[in-house]
Amino acid sequence: MAVKRDYYEVLGVQRNASQDEIKKAFRRLARQYHPDVNKAPDAEAKFKEINEAYEVLSDPEKRSMYDRFGHAGPTAAPGFDPFSSADPFSSIFETFFGGTMRGSQRGPQRGADLRYTLSISFEEAVFGVEKTIEFRRLETCPACRGSGAEPGTEPVRCPKCGGLGEIRQRAPLFNMVTVTTCDMCRGEGTVIAIPCRECRGEGRVRQTRKITVRVPPGVDNSSQIRISGEGDAGPRGGPYGNLYVVIDVQPHPYFIREGNDIILELPLNVAQAALGVEVEVPTIDGTEHLRIPPGVQSGAVFRIRGKGVPFLRSSGRGDQIVVVRVVIPTNLTDHQRRLFEELARSLEKEPIGGQRDEGFFGRIKNALGL
């Protein structure tokens, strides 16, 4: 069994210290070692030791007996109970630091956040759009204003916990206190005597809400837009949570987004690729004139600047990347076959091979600067 330290040593005062000195020393140490403030493993044990020393030295009768008989003296003093039902942690903070140190700090609780998936087109994601959405949420009951009590009545103090919102129990053999949330009032400290007929005592009712959401230009798929105060109402009149609108961008028939660039695959036949061609290329803004030089290879990349997606947090736009795809015919007419055979004979003396092709995806990466 551990030997108890001298109470004067515990508080760090002389044996002839005045009551004022003892009180100041205790207050300083209580602030330092209270378990709600100090998270050190031994803080609770030190705090109990400090509390026990102060309980003896602050009482003239107990102090006198302690000075005469040591630790055996105070335990024999009338009315002294080291396992008192009072909670030393809360009583000390109530006495010296104001208010109470309760395990469940009651007050308005914020409502839950909500999520809403908003589907928009590729063009709407590029240029931005305003959409009206409709969703269900919990709102503060207009009849009882969130109290849960029938209008004209008020919640009453919980008879089980006396309004504390928690139940405290002291172990019979140890100076330890267990704190549990009151199961009658669920930690609120009050109960509804006459429930509101509108919300059945819940303080909230589920309602349909309709709002307009502004989607900024350049928003990407799976982006979230936070709308403050549009979530569920908090219980008992607590503040509303937030609404998070998750953007779902629908795929485009032929545009593909890569960051702030838009990729378009441009099919050309063999003759167009060999001889070159001028084409009208679709962009997100309309059509653009593009000249394809003779001898272009499949996978060649052309850039149309400023025709991509707007930057979300700065000015300017990305580019449109046009990727050439040479289409080889599969069903030739007799005339076309003869022409290709003649072309093949004329190309027999041309060298095969040459510079190594970097491939389709390599060209895309180079065009995007990756």
Curated annotation (Swiss-Prot):
CDD domains: DnaJ, DnaJ_C, DnaJ_zf. Transmembrane segments: none annotated. A zinc finger (CR-type) spans 128-208. GO terms for biological process: chaperone cofactor-dependent protein refolding; DNA replication; protein refolding; response to heat. InterPro entries: DnaJ, DnaJ_C, DnaJ_domain, DnaJ_domain_CS, HSP40/DnaJ_pept-bd, HSP_DnaJ_Cys-rich_dom, HSP_DnaJ_Cys-rich_dom_sf, J_dom_sf. CXXCXGXG motif repeats lie at residues 141-148, 158-165, 182-189, 196-203. One of its GO terms (cellular component) is cytoplasm. Zn(2+) 1 binds at residues 141, 144, 196, 199. Its cofactor is Zn(2+). PANTHER family: CHAPERONE PROTEIN DNAJ, DNAJ HOMOLOG 1, MITOCHONDRIAL-RELATED. Belongs to the DnaJ family. Participates actively in the response to hyperosmotic and heat shock by preventing the aggregation of stress-denatured proteins and by disaggregating proteins, also in an autonomous, DnaK-independent fashion. Unfolded proteins bind initially to DnaJ; upon interaction with the DnaJ-bound protein, DnaK hydrolyzes its bound ATP, resulting in the formation of a stable complex. GrpE releases ADP from DnaK; ATP binding to DnaK triggers the release of the substrate protein, thus completing the reaction cycle. Homodimer. This is Chaperone protein DnaJ. The lineage of its organism: Bacteria, Bacillati, Chloroflexota, Chloroflexia, Chloroflexales. The gene is dnaJ.
